[in-house]
């Protein structure tokens, strides 16, 4: 007697390329299977370029992006932090071309000093002069600290930084194609979705307003407990230069709104007031802000982003409350003390 199995075979990633070229939409599982083949180096450069171009023309679905991110997470070097209710990442897609100072990096240390565990995932500069990795390196952080030391940073100090290049080695198979295309592809938005420590709560900045709802839906599909996705009038983070397009994920529901800085107790400022410079110059701005200094515009934009992060992590009842808490932390110098302790912690690997 033949016994039929009710177990469905996993999708064959090798067949998904043809589906994409036909204009078909993939399920999350199918997209994950295709990206797994990419991560394994089993998709030729020509086929990958064609698939990325087809996706760009047709437009990716939330399920496809979630599947791609799922495969990236599976292939990443893991950072095993102790179980906790909240583990936050504050990250942007980049690509806004605004050349601001390192707002999300500074924000991460303010939020961690306020008591929220942070596992920040970041890279060197792509479209700016100084990425999060560049400025943290300038501040004495060892970017090549091993995963266990980064996990210990989260567990013992409340913060860890994961240099993306070290945690996603499988992306090397896609790197030549991405460089040759010289255009935005789905890979530009996957990095913030593939935190190697498995952040439960995320603040994600994006470079187009229509991506706010899209990525919030992706994060819901990926099981995030809470998230805020923002486009800040040309910035891939909350801005103090105009309105913010925001989609929040809370209790499994998406809430879309336009948020003005004045609602949260911060003033409007011109974009020129938040421009940064070289890694050394941005490191000095971060140091000033974490020790209670900086300009009013710099303080306001970090306080706003930190306030939103504290709200996302469910530590305050409103962004305005979070802004007030962030101002207290910056004035106290606790964020700078934390950064110095974390830098010393990472240097243990080099000694």
Swiss-Prot record:
This enzyme catalyses: N-(5-phospho-beta-D-ribosyl)anthranilate + diphosphate = 5-phospho-alpha-D-ribose 1-diphosphate + anthranilate
Quick one: which residues bind Mg(2+) 1?
Answer: 104, 237
Record flagged with keyword Metal-binding:
yes
- The residues listed in the UniProt record as binding anthranilate 2, with positions renumbered to this chain, are 178
Write out the residues that bind anthranilate 1: 92, 123
Leading EC class: transferase
Gene Ontology cellular component? Answer: cytosol
Q: Does the keyword Magnesium apply?
A: yes
Q: Name one GO molecular function term.
A: magnesium ion binding
- Give the EC number(s) listed in the UniProt record: 2.4.2.18
Highest rank taxon of the organism: Bacteria
Pathway in which the depicted protein is active: Amino-acid biosynthesis; L-tryptophan biosynthesis; L-tryptophan from chorismate: step 2/5
Q: Which GO terms describe its biological process?
A: L-tryptophan biosynthetic process
What is said about its interaction partners and assembly?
A: Homodimer.
Q: What does this protein do?
A: Catalyzes the transfer of the phosphoribosyl group of 5-phosphorylribose-1-pyrophosphate (PRPP) to anthranilate to yield N-(5'-phosphoribosyl)-anthranilate (PRA).
Protein name (database record): Anthranilate phosphoribosyltransferase
Its organism's taxonomic lineage begins at:
Bacteria, Thermotogati, Deinococcota, Deinococci, Deinococcales
- Per the record, the gene is trpD
């Amino acid at each position: 007697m033949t016994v039929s199995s009710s177990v469905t075979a996993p999708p064959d990633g090798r067949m998904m390329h043809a589906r994409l070229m036909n204009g078909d939409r993939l399920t999350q599982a199918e997209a994950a299977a295709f990206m797994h083949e990419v991560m394994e180096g089993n998709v030729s450069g020509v086929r990958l370029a064609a698939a990325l171009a087809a996706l760009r023309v047709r437009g990716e679905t939330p399920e496809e992006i979630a599947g791609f991110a799922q495969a990236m997470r599976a292939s990443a070097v893991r950072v095993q932090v102790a179980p906790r209710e909240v583990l936050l990442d504050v990250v942007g897609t980049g690509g806004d071309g605004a050349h601001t100072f390192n707002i999300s990096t500074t924000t991460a240390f303010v939020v961690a000093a306020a008591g929220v565990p942070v596992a920040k995932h970041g890279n060197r500069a792509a479209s700016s002069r100084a990425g999060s990795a560049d400025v943290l390196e300038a501040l004495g952080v060892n970017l090549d600290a091993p995963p266990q030391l980064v996990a210990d940073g989260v567990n013992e100090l409340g913060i860890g930084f994961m240099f993306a290049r070290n945690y996603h080695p499988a992306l090397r198979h896609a790197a030549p194609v991405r460089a040759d295309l010289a255009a935005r592809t789905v890979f530009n938005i996957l990095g913030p979705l593939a935190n190697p420590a498995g952040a439960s709560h995320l603040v994600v900045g994006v470079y187009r307003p229509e991506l706010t709802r899209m990525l919030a839906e992706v994060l819901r599909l990926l099981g995030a407990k809470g998230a805020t996705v923002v486009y800040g009038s040309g910035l891939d983070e909350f801005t103090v230069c105009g309105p913010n397009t925001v989609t929040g994920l809370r209790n499994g529901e998406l809430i879309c709104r336009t948020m003005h800085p004045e609602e949260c107790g911060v003033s409007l400022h011109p974009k020129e007031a938040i421009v940064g410079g070289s890694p050394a110059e941005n490191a000095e701005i971060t140091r000033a802000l974490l020790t209670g200094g900086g300009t009013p515009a710099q303080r306001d934009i970090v306080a706003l982003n930190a306030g939103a992060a504290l709200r996302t992590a469910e530590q305050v009842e409103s962004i305005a409350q979070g802004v007030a808490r962030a101002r207290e932390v910056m004035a106290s110098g606790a964020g700078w003390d934390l950064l110095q302790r974390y830098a010393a912690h990472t240097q243990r690997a080099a000694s």
